[in-house]
Amino acid sequence: IPDMKIDNLMCTKRSFVEGRELEDNAFVIMNLKGSESVQAGAQVYCWASSINSGARHYHKIRVVGSKASLEWDDERPNQMLYEIEGEPSRVLERGAGYLTDEARVEDRIGGGHAEGLFEAWSNLYARFAVAMADADKGVYGDFWYPDVKAGAQGIKWIEKCVESADKGSAWVDYE
């Protein structure tokens, strides 16, 4: 989720299944710093669970703004729910002509056909290859792809969650 800078977070985690070495359920609340696209004090809620009875390996992202909300889940990967306050909900379809060029640029097989892991990895490799080719020319643009910094941020986030949970779900600064 672009431009999201964490100020502090609080995490609670536990195991519901007896004998599990790792926790199987966690909740995280994150307070965000202000930025160009994020209001200071906005919050992000994250629930990670392997005990959600009846659900498959379900991943959902919901972004709630002051005027509209977006929701995507991996059970319906070609659709995004778009809700504007005071208007009917809309379902945006992958590959549709009403989307921006930026949204359609990596749509390889057109709407109506499910994309998969192959295409996702291919998109990442293509972005990385363009960045490497430009770096060889001495051009260092602003390319989007997960890099070492993104990996380090992921590890830092997990460490901060564990720190918070180990302190009785205390708020911990992210910096």
State where each predicted segment sits.
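Contiguous beta-strand/loop segments that form the cofactor/metal-binding neighborhood of enzyme cores
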Residues: 1-87, 95, 114, 120-139, ...
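Nucleotide-sugar-dependent glycosyltransferase catalytic core
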Residues: 90
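Short glycine/proline- and acidic residue-enriched helix-loop micro-motifs
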Residues: 106-113
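Amphipathic alpha-helical blocks and their helix-capping loop/short-beta junctions
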Residues: 86, 97-106
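C-terminal lid/capping helical subdomain adjacent to the catalytic/cofactor pocket in oxidative enzymes
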Residues: 148-153, 164-175
